[in-house]
């Protein structure tokens, strides 16, 4: 839809690269729906309780857009007090809980939206990879 541009084309392209990088090699890896070029952002927050924040209760959120070379759709998943499983090493953060929900959602709704998975195309994030922090040994 035509409208007033809020960000420059360069800023928009860089944000799409950054969001794709989060899914390719960051905290959102479990959201990657092959061929759909998903980009996104994880968010995990401790819930407030009496006298401060609860270390045991969290809200996990993953906001995704796809396909990132020409975003058309957004999927937002928010899980209130997710439980970690053995498969997630009992982690409750968004990368382990909300991101897989996004991956399954996009894989199922993509074809209904007329989006054909394309394994040959992707968003080039190679210039950003040196910026990605990695723990020693990874």
Briefly describe each language-model feature range:
Residues 31, 35, 114-132:
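Acidic/histidine-enriched alpha-helical segments
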Residues 1-2, 10, 16-114:
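Active-site beta-strand/loop architecture of penicillin-binding DD-peptidases
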Residues 6, 14-17, 21, 124-138:
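Acidic, Ser/Thr-rich low-complexity intrinsically disordered segments
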């Amino acid at each position: 839809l035509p409208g007033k541009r809020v960000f420059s084309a360069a800023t928009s392209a860089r944000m799409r690269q950054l969001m794709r990088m989060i899914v390719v090699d960051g905290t959102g890896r479990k959201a990657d729906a092959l061929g759909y070029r998903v980009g996104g952002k994880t968010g995990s927050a401790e819930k407030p309780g009496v006298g401060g924040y609860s270390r045991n209760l969290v809200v996990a959120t993953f906001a995704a857009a796809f396909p990132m070379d020409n975003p058309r759709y957004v999927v937002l998943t928010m899980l209130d007090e997710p439980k970690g499983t053995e498969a997630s090493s009992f982690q409750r953060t968004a990368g382990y809980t909300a991101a897989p929900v996004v991956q399954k959602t996009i894989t199922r709704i993509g074809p209904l939206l007329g989006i054909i998975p394309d394994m040959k195309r992707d968003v080039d994030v190679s210039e950003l990879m040196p910026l990605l922090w990695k723990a020693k040994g990874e």
